[in-house]
Amino acid sequence: MEESSGRREELTSAEMQRKDDQAEAWGDRQLKKKKHTFRLLLQNTQRLPLSARDPKHEAILNWMFTDEANAVILTEINTYWPNVRPHQQWTERTRGKIPQGEKHRFVHNRHGSPTGTLQYGGVGTFALGPTRHRLCSTGEDLTGLGRWVWMRYKGKGEHHLRVVGAYRPNPQGTGEHTVHAQHQKYFLQKANNRDPQLAFTQYLSKQIKKWALLGDQIVIALDANDNLRDGSVQRMMARQ
């Protein structure tokens, strides 16, 4: 929670430097981070570039650094990692470019087999700076669909913080490679005819309850593709 003081507020790059619509900011104004603040950032990338020379790649790194992130969630990575060349893997193309240090984890649909590097969906999570040393474990959606990924931090005593990054598919479209179509294919192969959006909400709800029973404090960074004022995701969260 960051509160404004009476003095002139110092804005970060979230408001001052973003000019392209790929990094358009929504919500409250983001201020200079105060001491003892844990800052979590979320962005829908609409595909993470594979080239370290891509301006979008540089913009994402700059955003992480200048906006003083402790944790970052990227959704719609749109990358099939098994087909990405070694020199284009995240670790290789960011070597020496994140001075504060980082740990990361990407998830994608493991049941697909694209011929190239494009696969719609997927999520990435990053722990940055000194707080990354508090990271005790990471994990992902156990179905292998790449719907969410989490990082678990150890605090004082037995306190734990679980940061979850998730991407809920759009409603059914026309293509066979959309995230909705990928998930629907998986469920039908399991003789499960649930709508992928409904399945997402139900599965995540169960996971949240399990994590809560462990005593974790939980933060969900969600690209919901839904009305968060009165949609199904809002109702699911209200029941937790």
Residue ranges and their predicted role:
Residues 1-61, 129-240:
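Active-site regions of metal-assisted phosphoester/phosphodiester hydrolases
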Residues 58-138, 236-240:
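Active-site surface patch of divalent metal-dependent phosphodiester/phosphate bond hydrolases
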